[in-house]
UniProtKB/Swiss-Prot annotation:
Keywords: Amino-acid biosynthesis, Cytoplasm, Diaminopimelate biosynthesis, Lyase, Lysine biosynthesis, Schiff base. Its EC number is 4.3.3.7. Pfam families: DHDPS. Its main location: cytoplasm. The active site is at 139 (proton donor/acceptor), 167 (schiff-base intermediate with substrate). The gene is dapA. PROSITE patterns: DHDPS_1, DHDPS_2. It is an enzyme of class 4 (lyase). Belongs to the DapA family. This is 4-hydroxy-tetrahydrodipicolinate synthase. Pathway: Amino-acid biosynthesis; L-lysine biosynthesis via DAP pathway; (S)-tetrahydrodipicolinate from L-aspartate: step 3/4. It catalyses: L-aspartate 4-semialdehyde + pyruvate = (2S,4S)-4-hydroxy-2,3,4,5-tetrahydrodipicolinate + H2O + H(+). Catalyzes the condensation of (S)-aspartate-beta-semialdehyde [(S)-ASA] and pyruvate to 4-hydroxy-tetrahydrodipicolinate (HTPA).
Length: 298
């Protein structure tokens, strides 16, 4: 594995952004979360991705959260910045603002709502890559964006030097194989779906960008480590215990359930989210609580 691949591999946390009851970012809590994940053995953190509520933070807030996350990490764990937008100009602005932030790379989502063609996706990511030297990880999540970036488009983008990988969140693990075949073995593929993450690693993915990781960091780190070492029996044992959690953390829109779960476990002080997201429905809370118990976290 190349040095770059090892930087973006293993158990990567799609980190929540803790907030107080007024909707302000709780930076003291964020610092504790960073320490928690370093101690648990997580391999990298994604700051202000989907799970970090990037859509309801201003550009200035996004940049501040990323910079503070880098500051708290003190070089002990790579920080990947969520830097995507559905306007190419906005994504470029965000990416340029991160130039000297100390991040290891950027995670950039397929433009959402406006539903670009495959050529539009290619030109979007090409323009972003050309504005920076930072490594770029593409993010394909059709259930969120309304558009699916095809493996052939990914392969075209893989020819651009600083586009180094993709977070693939279609739940179709056969995509892992096809992207590797078309883009080459050195192109990083990361699963973006906890429930199929282990299967993705078996098929050649370098790791998982995980929501479950927020509340089961050590288990996810161990599972990925075992799987990448080829010890699938031990990896399967952990994954089976977490499977109910993998599913129930999406029982309402992410990051609603995972924020409640992190609050329930005392990892954050409040389950608060910014509107239009609201806290986990009271009638759903016992179900997520049961999943935490099955996982051995309660």
């Amino acid at each position: 594995m190349s040095a770059q691949n090892s930087l973006f591999s293993g158990s990567i946390v799609a980190l929540v952004t803790p907030m107080n009851h007024y909707g302000e970012v709780d930076f003291s809590c964020l610092e504790k979360l960073v320490e928690h994940h370093i101690e648990a053995g997580s391999n990298a953190l994604v700051s202000v991705g989907t799970t970090g509520e990037s859509a309801t933070l201003s550009i200035e807030e996004n940049v501040k959260v990323i910079e503070k996350t880098v500051e708290f990490a003190k070089g002990r764990i790579p920080i990947i910045a969520g830097a995507g937008a559905n306007a190419t100009s906005e994504a470029i602005t965000m990416t340029k603002l991160l130039r000297d932030s100390g991040v290891a790379g950027c995670l950039s989502v397929v433009p959402y709502y406006n539903k670009p063609t495959q050529e539009g996706m290619y030109q979007h990511f090409k323009a972003i890559a050309e504005c920076t030297d930072l490594p770029q990880i593409l993010y394909n999540v059709p259930s969120r964006t309304g558009s699916d970036m095809k493996p052939e488009t990914v392969a075209r983008l893989a020819e651009i030097e600083n586009i180094v990988g993709i977070k693939e969140a279609t739940r179709d693990v056969s995509r892992i194989v096809k992207i590797k075949q078309l883009a080459g073995k050195n192109f990083i593929v990361l699963s973006g779906d906890d429930a199929t993450g282990l299967e993705a690693i078996k098929l050649g993915a370098e790791g998982v960008i995980s929501v479950t990781n927020n509340i089961a960091a050590k288990d996810m780190a161990d599972m990925c480590r075992y799987a990448l070492a080829g010890d699938f029996d031990k990896a399967e044992e952990i994954n089976a215990r977490l499977m109910r959690l993998h599913h129930d953390l999406f029982i309402e829109s992410n990051p609603i359930p995972v924020k409640w779960a992190a609050y329930r476990l005392g990892l954050i002080k409040s389950p608060h989210l910014r509107l239009p997201l609201t806290t986990l429905s009271e009638e759903i809370q016992p179900k997520v609580g049961d999943a935490l118990k099955i996982a051995g976290l309660l």
